[in-house]
Amino acid sequence: MRVVILLLSSFLLLCVNVGQSRAQSLSQQENSKYSPDEIVGAGSSFFGGVSSGLAHLVEHAVSQWGLPNGYILGQEVTGAFVGGLRYGKGTLFTKNAGDLPVYWQGPSLGWDFGGDGARTMMLVYNLPATAAVYQRFGGVAGSAYFIGGLGMTVLAANGMAVVPIRSGIGLRLGANIGYLKFTPEPTWNPL
């Protein structure tokens, strides 16, 4: 009888420990994500006067994709005449792995004309490790910047999503297909 009680109590103790470690793991995953208030706070100081529009876009992104576990703040320039190019640089911020410099480049093709410069905040979803951001993220983009404003697109690769939110200055109108390639060093080659 003692053996049965000992085995049963050992089993229950094991179940409790497994449950606690699973709860701790879920808690750590949630602690590595950014709340909408944290994102809007970081973006408001970065973008300045467009914070109400930013709050609306962040709200929409969170309702679609949940809480991001990273975000990028940076600047970029683009130009297009049917085919286009985009170049940018910024910093990837994460709660559990620190900050990391990132550069991005990308070609696009479609009905797209003009040029713009933009401050960019990119929400990063399902980032397993900071180095995982260094790849190509593809998507369809539409933009209508008329002397300023905000725009949002979605790019995806390997179960991850990057949601760029841009506040641009310039004149650009179009819709295109393209990708962004993230690199640890700057490069002129968008391919």
Residue ranges and their predicted role:
Residues 17-23:
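Sec/Tat signal peptide C-region and signal peptidase I cleavage site
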Residues 6-16:
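Bacterial N-terminal signal peptides
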Residues 24-191:
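Small-residue-enriched, tightly packed secondary-structure blocks
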Residues 1-4:
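Positively charged n-region of N-terminal signal peptides that target proteins for export
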